[in-house]
Amino acid sequence: MKTYESNEYDVIVVGAGHAGVEAALASARMGEKTLLLTINLDMVAFMPCNPSVGGPAKGTVVREIDALGGEMGKNIDATYIQMRMLNTGKGPAVRALRAQADKWQYHERMKDTIENEPNLTLRQAVADELIVEDGVCKGLITNTGAKYYAKSVVLTTGTAARGKIIIGELAYSSGPNNSLPSIKLPENLEKLGFKLRRFKTGTPPRVDGNTIDYSKTQEEPGDKEPRHFSYTSKDSDYLEDQMSCYMTYTNTVTHDIIRANLDRAPMFSGVIKGVGPRYCPSIEDKVVRFADKDRHQIFLEPEGRHTKEIYVGDFSTSMPEEVQLKMLHSVAGLEKAELMRPGYAIEYDVIEPWQLKHTLETKNIKHLFTAGQMNGTSGYEEAAGQGLIAGINAALSAQNKPGFTLQRDEAYIGVLIDDLVTKGTNEPYRLLTSRAEYRLLLRHDNADLRLTEKGHELGLISEDRYKEFQDKKQAISQAMEAIKKVTIHPTDEVQEYLASVKQDRLNAGVSGADFLKRPRVTFDAVERLSGETLATDRYVKEQVEIALKYEGYIKKEKTLVDRLHRLESKKIPVDIDYNAIPSLATEARQKFEKIRPESIAQAERISGVNPADLAILTAYIQQGRIAKVKNK
């Protein structure tokens, strides 16, 4: 095709899903002239699978995005139809906020935000080829022949890269939700030397809410107490008129239908070659893997206020449509459910993420960044977190400034990216609280305290918001000092309260801080029993309560973090030749050469590397015996 010279930009972002919109907004807000390309303008920030945001670990990522100046938290706070805090009976490290989204409003508001952002141009086009000169990405060419030049390029192709939808015996080339696939770009990446692999994900059927018998299901309403993802949202704006979700179960009849049709299931017939997500298996996969289970939980989730489409959660399937109908009709409440959209599986290309730096810049092509599902992750939140980091670094690269990274002790986003670039992934990667060594430090409630300073330094947090943040920090400090000074005496009222929360009697007066450390004792109780007002903001009270109750555990984690920082400070020269290091185990040498860790701490996290290998590597570097990589 004949090409033509189009406009020039500082940063170009390819793909306007959850990664792409964060990347483009971050770049534009940092002052860079930014172009955002999407295959379809009607699918900006679209939710092709679950109409929700948040959940364990993921909810914390949304808070981190917000604390850094990203958009996802604000967008869901403006468009949710239900909000719930999960794991409220557990400790603060695993509490998680989850919102049910109006998926159409979510898309519309995000598109509106992008269209009204200075420095940002939104355009519909398919990126076919990168312009690369001397190992540096200079721009791209679209399917219409337009040549766009830029200082940095961010790729966020999602599941569109050579996407293939599969429903039973039917298979066809497609992106998510029957959008156009991206064919030429992944082919171009392979020609440029990138290693790609094939992953698979899936989505459940949607049914007509008018045809569900909700009397046979269990209602799951939202929370009455105000909850928010964005630190800028006000309690007074909390939605009272929320929509409920409903819970039901599969049964032995459902499982028998699935087992009788496994020969037609693409997952088991060999049609699907891509590796699927371990933590979001299809219903047919669950029935086979957990054959001893008589039933599996299903959530019926509304997709918005102005649609009757209901998402049948935890029922992902690629069975033939007729089998899907039989499966649905065997479930309590869905006996007469009308299918509106069948479930499907989608196969797509991903880049092997060990080919990336922690900035999400590719190692072999400068000024080229990748983010989101194309890096091997699953989930909107994981994508958005990566998109934000890639967008920040694309802007910094365009400004010739050093890159921005988050460490494992600073954010779940840091854990996610480090896992990807250090370990790679053999399946769609899902962020879990168990992946974070320092999860008591990386809580849902303190993302602003961890990251707002960084967002402000990057220019993504306004001066007004930064002042509010500083005021909150000061209020926490003042409340902490005040509660240490107040004394709780062993009065009858105090003893009665302690008995009500199943705590031992008080024998002598103690400080309010020591009193609060007792299990089930609350900050409000300290105020009531002391007769003192120590804080007025409930979020300030929450910070003081957590800091005191978990003081010992937090101190232990900070000791571990100090060790991490010492190892992170031991940098590995970029040009080291691992083949020149004597006594290094073959497996360690191969993995060091492939991943090329940036520090001893990162080298330690590579699977298959033992302490002896680390000791040899450390000694080699300290002795200054660095062998230069020979020019090939």
From Swiss-Prot:
Needed co-factor(s): FAD
InterPro entries, alphabetized: FAD/NAD-bd_sf, GIDA_C_N, MnmG, MnmG-rel, MnmG-rel_CS, MnmG_C, MnmG_C_subdom, MnmG_C_subdom_sf
Keyword Lipid biosynthesis tagged: no
GO biological process: tRNA methylation; tRNA wobble uridine modification
Spans annotated as Disordered: 205-231
Residues reported to bind NAD(+): 276-290
NAD as UniProt keyword: yes
Family annotation (Pfam families): GIDA, GIDA_C_1st, SAM_GIDA_C
GO cellular component: cytosol
Oligomer and partners: Homodimer. Heterotetramer of two MnmE and two MnmG subunits.
NCBIfam families for the chain: mnmG_gidA
Protein's recorded name: tRNA uridine 5-carboxymethylaminomethyl modification enzyme MnmG
Organism: Lactobacillus johnsonii (strain CNCM I-12250 / La1 / NCC 533)
